Amino acid sequence: MYSFTNDYNEIAHPNVMEALNNLAGKRFTGYGTDGLCKQVAEQVKHRIGQPNADIHFFNGGTITNLTTISHILRPHQAVISVVGGHIDVHETGAIEASGHKVITVESGSGKLTPAHIEKVLSEHPDEYSVQPKVVYISNSTEIGTVYRKAELVALRKICDENGLFLF
């Protein structure tokens, strides 16, 4: 049986568990200042080809989403999500508490489509309404559906055409 409740409800891959077990009993300073975090940060810098990048780690999804969204949006901008999408119902109001609106659209599949985005954009056409700027998806969705590559490409295309971030 598959469960799409959240990523915290499932056990880690056996290789991850083995690596964690190898660290049992060792002490770390935490807050991203220990040797392991520094090592991983260096690996990330190498992977992205940015040796001077400033890498920080977050310990949960809500704080990650809140930090990212609050830093990429201006006060008059909003996030587009499906009704029942993760950011709509599982962030305990964190996004709204930052002053940003989550604009929701109905989707029986749990997925956003370019048509959904076009509809939201047409409903927010000028400076007198909140301006959509982030398109937020979860893959898999809250109901277990998974975006196909073609669907993701189509979302990327409409976001690029309209100056939206796909997150």
Predicted segments with their positions:
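Conserved N-terminal alpha-helix of the aminotransferase class I/II PLP-enzyme fold
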Residues: H13-G60, V83-D88, A94
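Conserved core of the PLP fold type I
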Residues: N52-L73, I103-S107
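Conserved PLP-anchoring active-site segment centered on the Schiff-base-forming lysine
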Residues: H71-V89
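Hydrophobic beta-strand scaffold residues
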Residues: V79, V102-I103, L166-F167
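Glycine/small-residue-rich loop that forms an oxyanion/phosphate-binding "nest" at active or ligand-binding sites
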Residues: I87-E91, E96-A97, I103-E106
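PLP-dependent aminotransferase-class I/II
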Residues: G99-E142, V146-A154, E161
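Short beta-strand/loop segments at the ligand-binding rim of alpha/beta enzyme cores
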Residues: C159-F167
